[in-house]
Amino acid sequence: YPSDHVTTLETDSRFGLQAHYEVNPQLELASQVVHKRRLPGSKPFESVEWLYAAFKPTDAVMVRVGRTNPDLFLLSDYRNVGVAYPWVRPSTDLYAALPLYTMDGTDVSYAWQQQDARWRLKTFLGSGDTRATSATSREQVIFQLRSAGGAILTREQDGMLMRATLGGARMKAESAASVYAARDRLRSLQSHPDPTVAQQARELEKNWGLETDTALFAELGISYDRDDWIWSAEYALVRISSGTRSAQSAYVSLGRRIGDFTVYGMLGRSLSKLPVQNTPDWTGISSDAQTLATQLTYGINGSRARQSTLSLGTRWDFHPQMALKVQLDHFWVSPTGSGLWVGPSLSAARPNVLSATLDFTF
């Protein structure tokens, strides 16, 4: 958890540039580069979040090829564009749990009109990587999503947007050599003559989640923005048979415009599906084995996300292209539920975060 009274400019600061070029009415080129705080070791190309060609064979069909945003959430198209939403940041309970910003591949969308409603069906296929800190140390883990595919259905009418997403991917975690050395020591215990020890070692490796696995993702979202009222709600479910990433998360938000000001509130919740991991007693094997069991159990439990968040704030649109926001977040973090915070911790906490941002476009 953050130390008391820490002030930083890094958490929500970012600078982005977009470029669009219309080759002809059927072909468009687009790119977006976002500079923001990233984990050490991040490659420069990770800052390139768009780099694609969009082809429109008809007014109803669009095909994009290249690097695009994974259209998995309500805010996928503009999650880095602060002036586009009322809060200081999107719900951390849902969006921080799935920090996937880019996908390399292709998507095809088809749009049609039905009376006053506009529908769109999009399918996608590609791959993407995202970085995270290891639950057991300061080592990083790169989650590689391969053969990712899915479909999104949206409906817009009179200021209301409804959407549903269903997708899947093959996922593998890649980390430092020291992490794999620990895994090899754990695997050696899976052939221990004591069947209890062997089973405990297999369970620890499964819950550690370093091996290739299938990830399933489902999302439902709804938003309304008309006249003086804005509200939204979103639910996401991630199912992975190994590791601690299986979870469900949701948020609801309500806002009211009063002249140039918008006041809002948001409630969020994130729940890991993995039960608390008990520490095996391997003291009879060796001190090294017990240390390994303790460290892995601590890291697995420390990467579980079980928290609730209440956010209250206001936004002042003092210029057509600028907005000043102030937001207070209060978190209820359960024991062994701090997976959305930096560094593993098994303790419960109720931190507060006060944020102020100036969002602008030019």
Predicted regions, residues:
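Outer-membrane beta-barrel pore domains
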Residues: 54, 164, 168-170, 179-362
